[in-house]
């Protein structure tokens, strides 16, 4: 039986696409009884609530909170202890190779659009992502665009890069949806869902909302997503708003699969 380790530390942090990707793939794969799945994260209870309990599913509690310590020491130790055959990592693999590795690189936007990312971020991740991509036994990405960009930036032939496309999450159509107006005070609204960072251009959306004075027409701007990279333009604009304007702009966090978001 194949032993497959999944680096699931992303489930310990804020909601993001990488988390949804892992959840989607392995919610489908865990039905394969000829594979033993080892999910590793600090919040094991959260993983259990998502992937459930089965004979072929195991959970490993991570001790390291520091990514360097986790990749340099903890994962090599786990791989040896549990005699793992394959390990699946997002973007960056451990310093030492102890088994066959699956690496998913979702995108290289910091290389495609460098002006939106700090120099230190670009230098560090270019080095680590390239090292991981070239060393991977199985290299995955999520779109043909990313596949071509990985080839271009890292000089890796396309036949080594496999696309595992992002998909729409299936939602139980029997869920009783709450009245959005009653629950959130929303009637007419504009919705955007993503982390708040410069390249997502929330600042332009907010500026347009204010310049058109849509709040005076009864509209609200609903932003679902955590503040990620510093967005000074957005923060400055938001702080300059009047109380009336701020009452029409709602910012809150929710899982991409959370009922709160589904309701909205």
Regions found by a protein language model. Give the residues of each.
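Carbohydrate transferase catalytic cores enriched for Leloir-type hexosyltransferases
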Residues: 1-262
């Amino acid at each position: 039986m194949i032993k497959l380790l999944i680096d699931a530390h992303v489930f310990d942090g804020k909601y993001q696409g990488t988390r949804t990707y892992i959840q989607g793939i392995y919610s489908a794969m865990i039905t394969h009884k000829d594979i033993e799945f080892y999910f590793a994260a600090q919040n094991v209870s959260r993983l259990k609530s998502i992937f459930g309990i089965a004979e072929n599913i195991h959970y490993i509690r991570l001790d390291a909170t520091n990514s360097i310590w986790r990749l340099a020491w903890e994962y090599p130790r786990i791989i040896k202890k549990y005699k793992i055959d394959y390990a699946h990592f997002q973007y960056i693999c451990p310093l030492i190779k102890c088994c066959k590795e699956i690496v998913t690189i979702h995108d290289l936007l910091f290389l495609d659009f460098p002006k939106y990312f700090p120099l230190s971020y670009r230098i560090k991740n270019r080095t680590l992502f390239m090292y991981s991509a070239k060393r991977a036994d199985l290299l995955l990405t999520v779109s043909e665009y990313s596949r071509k960009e990985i080839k271009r930036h890292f000089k890796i032939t396309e036949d080594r890069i496999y696309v595992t496309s992002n998909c729409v999450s299936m939602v139980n159509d029997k869920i009783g949806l709450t009245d959005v107006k009653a629950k959130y005070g929303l009637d007419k609204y504009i919705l955007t869902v993503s982390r708040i960072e410069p390249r997502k251009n929330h600042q332009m959306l907010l500026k347009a909302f204010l310049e058109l004075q849509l709040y005076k027409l009864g509209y609200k701007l609903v932003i679902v997503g955590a503040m990620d990279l510093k967005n000074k333009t957005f923060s400055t604009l938001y702080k300059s708003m009047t109380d009336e304007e701020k009452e029409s702009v709602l910012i809150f966090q929710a899982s991409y699969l959370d009922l709160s978001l589904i309701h909205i």
